[in-house]
Every structure is written in C-alpha cells, then in structure tokens.
Amino acid sequence: MTSPLLLSAQDVSIYYGDKQAVKNVNLDVRPGTVNAFIGPSGCGKTTFLRAINRMHDLTPGARVTGSILLDGQDIYSPSVDPVAMRRRVGMVFQKPNPFPTMSVFDNVVAGLKLTGVKNRDHLMQVAERSLRGAALWDEVKDRLNTPATGLSGGQQQRLCIARALAVEPEILLMDEPTSALDPASTAKIEDLLGDLKKVTTIIIVTHNMHQAARVSDTTSFFLVGDLVEHGPTDQVFTNPRDERTEAYVSGRFG
C-alpha cells in the first residue's frame, strides 16, 4: 500500500524580481523517506528547498507562485503562521551555525525555550533525546555547559541537526550539510540519515552524486530551474528516463 503524501508541490515557480529561478515544479514527498535534490550549481535545487519553509519571505523581491501543501494545507496560505510552520519544517545549512554565545545544551533547546518551555527536567530530556538522535550524545554528554564553538566542525553540524530535531519537525531540510566537513564527519552524518528517517522526513540538497545514491530513497534532478526528473534513486541513477539526467549522473556535464 502506498503511503500518503506528506508534502506536495504543485506548479511551483520562484522569482527574484523578473527572473524566474524555478519553473512550474510538481513534486511529491512521502513520510519516512530521504529525498535528494541534485543538479549543477545554479540549477534551482536550493532555491526550491528554501521555499519549503518559506525562507524566501525574508528575501526582498522574491516571490513564490503555485502551492506547497504540507499535510494538505498550503504553507503559503494567509492563514498560516510562518513561524509555527517553520517548527514543522526544520533546516540545516551548508556550514555549521551553532549560536556562538550559547552552551551545547542551550543550543539544542533554544527553539523550545522560544515557545515558552521552561521546565529544566523536560528540557534535559529533550536535549538528550535530540543529541542521541544526532549521534552526538556520547561525545558531548560531559560538555553540555561548555561553549558550542568548542566542538569540531563535524560535531557542530550534528549539534545543528540536534537543535532542529528538538522541536520534532515533520520535515528536515538539509542544504549540502556535509560540503564543509571532512570525510570522517561526512560519513557519520550519512550514516545518521537512515536512523533519522524513522522519526522525520528528510530532503537533502547535495552536489555529491555518490552521496545522493548512498543515502536517498528518491532523487530529483534540477537543471536551469526545471525539475527534469524525479523518481526512485536506483532508477534515476541506473535507468533514467531523460537523456539530460543520464548525461549528468554519468558525469558528462556538471
């Protein structure tokens, strides 16, 4: 039996002023999956990713047309509170961005505190659960009150994942989360994705096609603002329907 849709993009276009950066994208995402967006630089994959939690609201001149449905509700509806929506759709950026003046513990629970949660025992439970979910607990359990900036780059990125997990998002967006990390740290985060999809749904932008093939259930190939192909990862990489996809995944351009 096919699982229900969690996210459905319908005729989504994104503009910066008069320039159309993403063109009429239609894309469905099912719960409990890892979904990779691939394509050359400037193809629209990150632009589309940022639309899924309304980050373009913060960009002067940017606008999004079409519909992005989360559990059947258009996230761009005037009745939707963007702040509340972003608690349902978390984001991990390309470079680790822990809050520099906060401890490891305070970084993880920052989102909960903003919603008014103050109970220390509850915050500690959430911090431990989230750090375990990000495969970081054993490395930092004795350093919770130390500055987050004292962690290594790979640890800081997993801390950012824990911070996103703390508010229990339905979707976790990841914009090239390993591009600034060494191979060992990259491997830890890749290993983590299989466990994370048990508790959330992941959409990851990556320039690394080997990474997309290793970690994702579905792959979407973007090119010059168009969604060229979307399907099961094995199919996209071994038997693509579009010759442009075949040319890209085989390394003939990119």
Curated annotation (Swiss-Prot):
**What keywords appear on the UniProt entry?**
ATP-binding, Cell membrane, Membrane, Nucleotide-binding, Phosphate transport, Translocase, Transport
Name the major location: membrane
Q: EC number(s) per UniProt?
A: 7.3.2.1
What are the GO MF terms of this UniProt record? Answer: ATP binding; ATP hydrolysis activity; ATPase-coupled phosphate ion transmembrane transporter activity
Q: Does the keyword Flavoprotein apply?
A: no
Ligand binding (ATP): 39-46
What family, per the record?
Belongs to the ABC transporter superfamily. Phosphate importer (TC 3.A.1.7) family.
* Job description of the protein: Part of the ABC transporter complex PstSACB involved in phosphate import. Responsible for energy coupling to the transport system.
UniProt-recorded name of the protein: Phosphate import ATP-binding protein PstB
Which species does the entry assign this protein to?
Deinococcus radiodurans (strain ATCC 13939 / DSM 20539 / JCM 16871 / CCUG 27074 / LMG 4051 / NBRC 15346 / NCIMB 9279 / VKM B-1422 / R1)
